[in-house]
Amino acid sequence: MSTFIGQLVGFAAIVFLVWRYVVPPVRRMMAARQDTVRQQLADAATAAVRLTESTTAHSKAVEAAKAEAEQVVAEAKEEAKRITAQMQTQAGVEAERIKVQGSRQVELLRTQLTRQLRLELGHESVRQASELVRNHVSDPGQQAATVDRFLDELDAMAPAAAEVERPVAAKMRSASRRALGSLVDKFAGLAKGLDNAALSALASGLVSVAQLLQREVIVTRYLTVPAEDAAPRIRLLERLISGQVGNPALDILRAAVTERWSASSDLIDAIEHVSRQALLEVAQRDGQVDEVEDQLFRFSRILDAQPRLSILLGDYVVPAEGRVGLLRKVLDSAGSVNPIAVALLSQTVELLRGQPAEEAALLLAEVAVARRGEVVAQVSAAAELSDAQRTRVTEVLSRIYGHPVTVQLQTDPTLLGGLSIAVGDEVIDGTLSSRLTAAEAQLPD
């Protein structure tokens, strides 16, 4: 019995302990579990609602998408129709433009081809004409006939006499031309009382003064200042050159600074011109003027044919003495050259002032001819002229220019026929080569 009671007490103690310590946590756990389940049930209900809503929204979205797709397709069809119509219109315009442009291009190509054919035909015609002309003038008689025909045309020209002045005065203005004329008259008066030695000394003295004035630009400007009283200029001149030149040269120079000059360089040109006149006067007295003129013209043609020599003679880096030395070597190698021609050419090389040597030599030759009141005509022909043709050229040109004419003939086979005549700046070109060139120049581009 006691055992039973003991067991009952033990069971009661166990029940108490379970009730006291186990039941409350279990109860709390079960309550929490119930809350969790209730929350899960609520969440499940919410999810079900959301699922229903999303299903409904999805259905609506699908319907809206279908409607929008149908609208987009409809709009796309309309846009496609509009674009198709627009492209058809543009294609028509572009096709018309291409058609017009193509027509223009065809017309342009036709024009270019026509022009090219005309040009080729023109060149071929000129070439054939040139061959015919060359074959024709290969006969000396026919070539001479071209000269005669040109002279007939020249003879038929109205004989409007041209005014021919001193070559050195061609580039001067009126005041300097008058001063040059007075200075030449002054020299002519002095030269009558001078012998050849005095004239040579006069030329040398004037050249030395021209070189001085060429170096001393300020002095030259002062000596050419236009003023009524020339006494100060004369005094300055006398202080500069007194005792260095003879009295004739001093008289010429006094007269020169008394005159009015348009440019200071004209004074130097005038002094150089008078020095040349002095040497040419010597040549005329000795009966050598024709030889001097011929040699001067020959040398000018040599310089024209030898540009390297012309450049060396006009090289201002080299002192004048060196250039004159080169000139004398060239003249010595040529054989017998008139001493007066040598002196004139030497002075010209010494006093070159920016002018090419070949032009200065030609001007010197023209000065020599013009001293006798003659005009120099540079005549170019394909072959030598007969004596009768030379005489006729001289007569016709003398009648045209109203002055005696000296003809300087140059031969150039490339001219083919006819003549080219140059008097000063005036050129009369009647050569066959120039006419062929003119015919070719008139061809269309």
Curated annotation (Swiss-Prot):
Stored NCBIfam families: ATP_synt_b, PRK13428.1, PRK13430.1
InterPro entries named among the record's database cross-references: ATP_synth_B-like_membr_sf (IPR028987), ATP_synth_b/b'su_bac/chlpt (IPR002146), ATP_synth_F0_bsu_bac (IPR005864), ATP_synth_OSCP/delta_N_sf (IPR026015), ATPase_OSCP/dsu (IPR000711)
Record's protein name: ATP synthase subunit b-delta
Subcellular location: Cell membrane
Membership in a protein family: In the N-terminal section; belongs to the ATPase B chain family.
Membrane topology designation: Single-pass membrane protein
Subunit structure: F-type ATPases have 2 components, F(1) - the catalytic core - and F(0) - the membrane proton channel. F(1) has five subunits: alpha(3), beta(3), gamma(1), delta(1), epsilon(1). F(0) has three main subunits: a(1), b(2) and c(10-14). The alpha and beta chains form an alternating ring which encloses part of the gamma chain. F(1) is attached to F(0) by a central stalk formed by the gamma and epsilon chains, while a peripheral stalk is formed by the delta and b chains.
CDD domains named in the record: ATP-synt_Fo_b
ATP synthase subunit b: annotated span: 1-168
Pfam families with a match to the protein in the record: ATP-synt_B, OSCP
Gene: atpFH
Region of interest (ATP synthase subunit delta), ranges: 169-445
Record carries keyword Cell membrane: yes
Molecular function, one GO term: proton-transporting ATP synthase activity, rotational mechanism
GO cellular component: plasma membrane; proton-transporting ATP synthase complex
Origin: domain of life: Bacteria
Functional note: F(1)F(0) ATP synthase produces ATP from ADP in the presence of a proton or sodium gradient. F-type ATPases consist of two structural domains, F(1) containing the extramembraneous catalytic core and F(0) containing the membrane proton channel, linked together by a central stalk and a peripheral stalk. During catalysis, ATP synthesis in the catalytic domain of F(1) is coupled via a rotary mechanism of the central stalk subunits to proton translocation.
Keyword annotations of the record: ATP synthesis, Cell membrane, CF(0), Hydrogen ion transport, Ion transport, Membrane, Multifunctional enzyme, Transmembrane, Transmembrane helix, Transport
TM region positions: 4-24
Organism: Mycobacterium ulcerans (strain Agy99)
